[in-house]
Amino acid sequence: MAEITAALVKELREKTDAPMMECKKALTEAEGDLARAEEILRVKLGNKASKAAARVTAEGLIGLYISADAKQGAVIEVNCETDFVAKNDDFVAFVNKLAELVTTQKPADVAALSALPLGEGTVETTRTALVGKIGENISVRRFERIETANALASYVHGGKIGVLVEYAGAEEVGKDLAMHIAATKPRALNADGVPAADIAAERSVAEQKAAESGKPAEIVAKMVEGSVQKFLKEVTLLSQPFVKNDKQTVEQMLKEKSASINKFVLFVVGEGIEKKTSDFAAEVAAAAAGRA
């Protein structure tokens, strides 16, 4: 059997774009025969779209759509691998069409959306064709749809931050709320909506800091509670200073305008996705270690 060298693994990886360890396994199975290893990988990984699916999609675009009567709307995140593709006209059109489909067809989840008719096929076949055309993995990550008797407003910042707001009041209020949310990124409408885990984490940090002060227990308790309340004011929409007038909170602004907000959705591209950084030397070392 031919020796499975790092150079051979590198060559196969460049030919197939498969992960380093998959290349090593294929070469081992093929006993060092590069052509056979390539065929093994193609069977394993399928066509170009399947092959691309192994790659991390941390870039992308936020799509938004609101019906003409502003009663129905949707926000969607579709990911790709690079910011360059996120600006591709075909990719942008695909994302915007999906936002419209979510609004009008009301799919329950991403799987249901993928099965919807689009063009001469489905959303999924269109996505697969786009992967083949562009050469990058594309994945529909998430969406949220709102239908209301009140009104909807939206704001997209650079295609990377998208906000959908359900509110009651003047149209200007809806626009202001959407822009404020994009700028400040609140976690919830009010304190009741902040995840308990987030509050617990903040309390833990505050307790550690307060304990280091050396103050009496009752003072420490007040310091901790003060820190938690400060945190809640910073991350809840209604308690935040309004971006267009920081002398009043968002709640005060709404009261002044005789308006209200029922719900908001905030999507940030790639939020929570760990971006993969390529270190070929490290991958070669890992492959070599696995061979030893």
From Swiss-Prot:
Family from the record: Belongs to the EF-Ts family.
Molecular functions (GO terms): translation elongation factor activity
Main location: cytoplasm
Keyword Nucleotide-binding: no
NCBIfam families, sorted: tsf (TIGR00116)
Gene: tsf
Key words, A-Z: Cytoplasm, Elongation factor, Protein biosynthesis
General function of this protein: Associates with the EF-Tu.GDP complex and induces the exchange of GDP to GTP. It remains bound to the aminoacyl-tRNA.EF-Tu.GTP complex up to the GTP hydrolysis stage on the ribosome.
Record InterPro entries: EF-Ts_dimer_sf, Transl_elong_EFTs/EF1B, Transl_elong_EFTs/EF1B_dimer, Transl_elong_Ts_CS, UBA-like_sf
Name of a matching Pfam family: EF_TS
Organism (species): Bordetella petrii (strain ATCC BAA-461 / DSM 12804 / CCUG 43448)
A GO cellular component entry from the record: cytoplasm
Residue segments, region Involved in Mg(2+) ion dislocation from EF-Tu: 82-85
Localization, UniProt: Cytoplasm
Name the record gives this protein: Elongation factor Ts
